[in-house]
């Protein structure tokens, strides 16, 4: 971790300089803003400035954007226009894992794109201790007692795993 927020315009590179995993100007979910963020992802570089094969994998939205995201990704033509142009997002299959709805985003307009960064090098979930259960009875009241215990940790190794806007 580099000490920055998950989405930042100034994540430090190990060899100097910075990179961004956030749109320069915050934008609502739209065909154009998705295309802009996908271009930013596909032009990503490693810590030495070399282009890497980073591609969008899935679109993550809050409930307020669920229907708009579905329209944008599933229409055969451009969204909300009289143009007869194809929907490049659908035609190219930009999001092979589709749209993911997250009920817990703190902003109703939040949306993010998860990338194909190597497993274990992006967003990580570590299960430190597996779920265990214990059961007992309270002697004086005869009430059943139950205890569930689990330990885990979440983090990020490389912020290039997720791009988005605020």
Where would I find each of the regions flagged by the language model?
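Short, glycine/acidic-rich hinge or "gate" loops at secondary-structure transitions
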Residues: 1-9
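Sequence/fold signature of self-assembling virion shell proteins
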Residues: 16-43, 53-58, 64-166
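Catalytic micro-motifs at enzyme active sites that drive phosphoryl/nucleotidyl and oxygen chemistry
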Residues: 46
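Helix-loop elements that line ligand-binding/catalytic pockets
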Residues: 49
């Amino acid at each position: 971790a580099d000490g920055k927020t998950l989405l930042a315009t100034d994540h430090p590179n190990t060899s100097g300089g910075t990179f961004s995993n956030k749109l320069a100007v915050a934008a609502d979910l739209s065909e154009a803003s998705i295309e802009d963020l996908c271009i930013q992802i596909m032009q990503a570089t490693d810590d030495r400035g070399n282009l890497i094969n980073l591609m969008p994998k899935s679109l993550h939205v809050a409930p307020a954007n669920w229907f708009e995201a579905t329209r944008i990704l599933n229409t055969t033509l451009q969204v909300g226009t009289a143009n007869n142009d194809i929907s490049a997002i659908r035609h190219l299959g930009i999001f092979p894992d589709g749209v993911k709805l997250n009920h817990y985003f703190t902003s109703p307009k939040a949306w993010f794109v998860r990338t194909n960064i190597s497993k274990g090098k992006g967003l990580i979930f570590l299960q430190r201790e597996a779920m265990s259960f214990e059961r007992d009875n309270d002697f004086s009241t005869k009430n059943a007692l139950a205890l569930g215990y689990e330990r885990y940790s979440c983090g990020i190794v490389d912020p290039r795993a997720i791009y988005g806007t605020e």
